[in-house]
Amino acid sequence: MTPANKSDKDRVVIFDTTLRDGEQCPGATMTFEEKIEVAEMLDGMGVDIIEAGFPIASVGDFEAVAEIARNARNAVIAGLARAIPGDIARAGEAVRHARRGRIHTFVSTSPIHLAHQMRKSEAEVLEIITATVKQARNLVEDVEWSAMDATRTPIDYLCKCVEAAIAAGATTINLPDTVGYAVPDEYRRMFKTIRERVPSADKAIFSVHCHDDLGLAVANSLAGVEGGARQVESTINGIGERAGNAALEEVVMAIKTRADVMPYWCNVESTMLTRASKMVSAATSFPVQYNKAIVGRNAFAHESGIHQDGMLKNAQTYEIMTPESVGVKQTSLVMGKHSGRHAFQHKLEELGYKLAENQLQDAFVRFKALADRKKDIYDEDIIALVDEEMAATHDRIKLSSLTVIAGTHGPQRATMKLTVSGQTRIEEAEGNGPVDAVFNCIKRLVPHEAKLELYQVHAVTQGTDAQAEVSVRLSQDGRAMTSKAADPDTLVASAKAYLGALNKIVMKHQRDVPAAAAS
């Protein structure tokens, strides 16, 4: 349905070639079942044309195209064919059961291709175009013809090829930037010139098909639309030969987001883009780069303190589209070394903490120190940090520094600095292992009778830089006190946990003495 205040002549037809050109990407082969699943997703999200494969390439490709053609509910199903009679017949057979089938046939037109690959003259190629397009048109009503390497083809000859294809019955004319050589203004002018110079141009829809060798595939695709093309060929996640194709999700969101300067529209349901991206990534085993536009993990993630502050005040300060518009649940404020105090406070409130000003500042300082040491900060890291901070507020004994020397030979040695009731104490001790050395050091610095009953370690989060959470239980005079502490360094976490339990024993003793005297 044409949207309000938009005309049908400004509709951009979205042609997806993930299952054909995308699968030609080395290593991106999909199984029969995966192709069917991807095709169902594309059909369901409003893609207009699905190029389901290259039927002559293999029995498996033929069967996949035929099955997709039988099951498609809305999309036109296209099969690719070289300008060879056998290819065209095979493609026609594959799509014959589709509600709407298309044969997409192509031939090279550039001088370098004609001389070194085709070994044909310009006149011979014109004859091939006429014959093969007519053959395809006898099999289906919808025929697309492509001029391979169009952007390196002289414009006069390209006009003759286009005219011949339309005269033979082509309903769509595709002018690909096969090797990703064009720049946007050049590509725009090519379409404009051909549509002006070919008398029958209004009898066909013009199509763009851009590769990303210079990183210009999406920009060139949009430029082609501005030049008069009304079909864009693209792939999910931009997968394809060499550097890939124009990414479908980027084309769609550019059209939707910049409707203020581009009066175009398309039928694709953008809220399904992220799901489609994940499906194709899983099927091809090609991970999506983190900073990939629209569907990358970081597309709606913010770590910079300045950006996070702006996002908390008004999301439009740093987001030009909503995450929900592409199927992402919400924006992510990533906590890291670049995060600011405002974002840290917001994260604490999300986690259920409301700290006093001095507690917040202390926790923020410790958070920044942790972020300098740890690549990924998870909610569990922040919870462990704040719980430890709140528990340590009234501690009499505090860890200032710890150095441990450990190795395969000889005893392990720990050197520790503690602040005890405001006074600094330094000591070193040996032990049967680094943890034993740390605990022996504490016993020298703060002599006590408490016995170690429990020592447990587990990782708070995943990864080699995960924080270790250590639990320690000490008992004295029949009473047991347990404390937990977390740190990327297991030995530091062990010292903090031990001191936490020891502080609880000290505080308990201080409360018990006045109570005994009063009785």
From Swiss-Prot:
Residues that coordinate or bind Mn(2+): D21, H209, H211, N245
Highest taxon of source: Bacteria
GO BP annotations, alphabetical order: L-leucine biosynthetic process
Chief place where the protein resides: cytoplasm
Pathway listed: Amino-acid biosynthesis; L-leucine biosynthesis; L-leucine from 3-methyl-2-oxobutanoate: step 1/4
Subunit details: Homodimer.
Record's protein name: 2-isopropylmalate synthase
Top EC class, one word: transferase
Needed cofactors: Mn(2+)
One of the record's GO cellular component terms: cytosol
GO MF terms, alphabetically ordered: 2-isopropylmalate synthase activity; acetyl-CoA C-acetyltransferase activity; manganese ion binding
UniProt region (Regulatory domain), positions on chain: 398-519
Function: Catalyzes the condensation of the acetyl group of acetyl-CoA with 3-methyl-2-oxobutanoate (2-ketoisovalerate) to form 3-carboxy-3-hydroxy-4-methylpentanoate (2-isopropylmalate).
Domain Pyruvate carboxyltransferase as annotated: residue spans: 12-274
Protein's cellular compartments: Cytoplasm
Keyword Transferase in record: yes
Its EC number(s): 2.3.3.13
Gene3D superfamilies reported for this sequence: 1.10.238.260, 3.30.160.270, Aldolase class I (3.20.20.70)
Stored HAMAP family: LeuA_type1
Keyword annotations: Amino-acid biosynthesis, Branched-chain amino acid biosynthesis, Cytoplasm, Leucine biosynthesis, Manganese, Metal-binding, Transferase
Annotated catalysed reactions: 3-methyl-2-oxobutanoate + acetyl-CoA + H2O = (2S)-2-isopropylmalate + CoA + H(+)
